[in-house]
Every structure is written in structure tokens, then in C-alpha cells.
UniProtKB/Swiss-Prot annotation:
This is Phospholipase A2 MALT0035C. Its main location: secreted. Residues 22-27 form a propeptide. GO terms for cellular component: extracellular region. Binds 1 Ca(2+) ion per subunit. It comes from Micrurus altirostris (Uruguayan coral snake). The active site is at residues 75, 121. It is found in: Secreted.
Length: 142
């Protein structure tokens, strides 16, 4: 093998070894965002809920700051249960749902994991729609 081929092979191996340490990105957040937009038309889920209170967004700890934050806490627990009961990865689980008249319907999900995760997101989206949004709680875990 000539030196140029070895150099390319080494670069590919180094790139792949670095890529293996990158955490997978949540694939179903787009679906969850679509559900929120179904129940709260005109909302911007990624902007509005990515860092709200103590539980909306990545991680979660402490005491929820309000009803909306409790929705996120319950959603986090639901995702934990999805893994515990079905050994599925909620952030990577893609499912089927429809939206009609601000109502989300989970349907056509062929595995218990997909059905469970879809229901986690559906319940959370409905909870968000019933909870007041307090701008003071964005980026604020008391």
C-alpha cells in the first residue's frame, strides 16, 4: 500500500474513533415538537421549552417551578419508564401520530416501545397546552 493510501486510511480511522464518542442526538424531538405545535398552535417548542424551569430541556433535578415544569418532570419520568419497562431509547424512537383539531392521536405504532414513547409525548403535549407559560421561568431553576 502506498503512503498516500495509508495516510487517508489513518485519517478515516481517527475520524471514526472521534465520532464514536459523540452522543447520539435525539431523533424524536422533532416529532415531540410537532405534537406541541398541534396542541399549542403558533408555539416554538425548541425555543420555548428547551430551558424552562428545572425539568424542561436536558436533564432535570430539584423542585419544579410551576405546572408547566411539572409536565416536563412527568415527561422525564415517562421516558425513564420507557427504558425500564421496554428497554427502548425514547430519544431515538420514531413513532407514528396524527394531529387534528389540536388533538394528537398515536396510531400505527408496531412495537410497545413506539406506542409507549408516543403516549409519553402525547400526554406531555396535552399537559403543556393546559399549563400557563411564565417567561420568568425560562432559564430559571429556583
Amino acid at each position: 500500500m502506498n503512503p498516500a493510501h495509508l495516510l487517508v486510511l489513518a485519517a478515516v480511522c481517527i475520524s471514526l474513533s472521534g465520532a464514536s464518542s459523540i452522543a447520539p442526538q435525539p431523533l424524536n424531538l422533532i416529532q415531540f415538537g410537532n405534537m406541541i405545535q398541534c396542541t399549542i398552535p403558533g408555539s416554538s417548542p425548541l425555543l420555548d421549552y428547551a430551558d424552562y424551569g428545572c425539568y424542561c430541556g436536558r436533564g432535570g433535578s430539584g423542585t419544579p417551578v410551576d405546572k408547566l415544569d411539572r409536565c416536563c418532570q412527568a415527561h422525564d419520568k415517562c421516558y425513564t419508564d420507557a427504558y425500564r419497562f421496554y428497554r427502548c431509547w425514547p430519544f431515538l424512537t420514531l413513532y407514528s401520530h396524527t394531529c387534528s383539531n389540536r388533538k394528537v392521536i398515536c396510531r400505527g405504532n408496531t412495537t410497545k416501545c413506539k406506542a409507549f414513547v408516543c403516549n409519553c409525548d402525547r400526554v406531555a403535549a396535552n399537559c403543556f397546552a393546559k399549563a400557563p407559560y411564565n417567561k420568568r421561568n425560562y432559564n430559571n431553576c429556583k
